[in-house]
C-alpha cells in the first residue's frame, strides 16, 4: 500500500539538482516518460548544440535567450514564444545578457506519439482568453501538445476539480497556490511541478492575496483540439 509520501512523490516529484561545467543549474523532476527541467543560465553563457532521442519543448520564464534549433536561431523573451526540438534535431542556446535567464524545458519520448514541429521550430501565441471569470490563459499549440499559461486570481481564485483524457503537467512560475492531484495536496511555489496522468482528478486554489502564474502542458491538446486536428490534416 502506498503511503502519503509515496503519493506525493508520484504527483509532485522531488527535484534533483544537475550542475554543468558552464555554470548552468537544472532542477529535474520526472514521471514516467517525461522530464521537466527548470534551468538557470548564467550571464554570457553558451549551451552548446546537442541532440537526443527525446523531443524537447521549452520556454523562457525570465530574461531573454538566443535559442537555436536546427539551423534556425531566434531571440526568445519571457513567455512570448516556445520552441520544439524534435528527436535527434540539434539545439542549443546562448545568454548574451548581463542577467541570469530562467527557462523551462520538457523532454519526452513515448512510443505512440509523433513529434511534429513548425518548419522554423518555434511556436508563437495562438490565442489569449478567459478560461473562467478572472482567469486569463494564453495558448501555444502543435498537433500533439498544447501549452497553456494561466493566471489564477488571488483571494480564492480556483480551477475546480475535474478530470479528462489528457495527460497534464504544470509548473508554478509566479506566486503560489494549492494544487491537489488525486487527493494529494501540495503548496505550489516557484519551480514546483506536478504530473497528472489521464483521468486523474485534480484542481487548484489560490488562497493568497496575489495572482499566481503557471505553465500547463497537455498531451494531446485539450482546449484547442480543432486547431490541432487541422494542423494534422494539413501535414
Curated annotation (Swiss-Prot):
Source taxon at top rank: Bacteria
The keyword Nuclease is assigned to this record: no
EC assignment: 5.3.3.19
Record's subcellular location: Cytoplasm
SUPFAM superfamilies noted in UniProt: RmlC-like cupins (SSF51182)
Cellular component, GO annotation: cytoplasm
Pfam families given in the database record: Cupin_2
Enzyme class: isomerase
Residues that, per the record, bind a divalent metal cation 1: 50, 52, 56, 91
Major localisation: cytoplasm
Signal peptide coordinates: none
Keyword Cytoplasm: yes
Domain Cupin type-2 per the UniProt entry, residue ranges: 41-106, 151-216
Induction: The compound guanosine 5'-diphosphate 3'-diphosphate (ppGpp) is essential for the transcription of the bacABCDEF operon and BacG, and GTP regulates the transcription of both this operon and ywfH via the CodY-mediated regulation system.
Residues reported in the UniProt entry to bind substrate: 223
CDD domains the UniProt entry points to: cupin_BacB_C, cupin_BacB_N
Pathway, per record: Antibiotic biosynthesis; bacilysin biosynthesis
Catalytic activity: 3-[(4R)-4-hydroxycyclohexa-1,5-dien-1-yl]-2-oxopropanoate = 3-[(1E,4R)-4-hydroxycyclohex-2-en-1-ylidene]pyruvate
Binding residue positions for a divalent metal cation 2: 162, 164, 168, 202
Role of this protein: Part of the bacABCDEF operon responsible for the biosynthesis of the nonribosomally synthesized dipeptide antibiotic bacilysin, composed of L-alanine and L-anticapsin. Bacilysin is an irreversible inactivator of the glutaminase domain of glucosamine synthetase. BacB catalyzes the allylic isomerization of the endocyclic-delta(4),delta(8)-7R-dihydro-hydroxyphenylpyruvate (en-H2HPP) to generate a mixture of 3E,7R- and 3Z, 7R-olefins (E/Z ration of 3/1) of the exocyclic-delta(3),delta(5)-dihydro-hydroxyphenylpyruvate (ex-H2HPP).
PANTHER family (alphabetical): H2HPP ISOMERASE (PTHR40112:SF1)
Protein name from the UniProt record: H2HPP isomerase
Organism (species): Bacillus subtilis (strain 168)
Chain's gene name: bacB
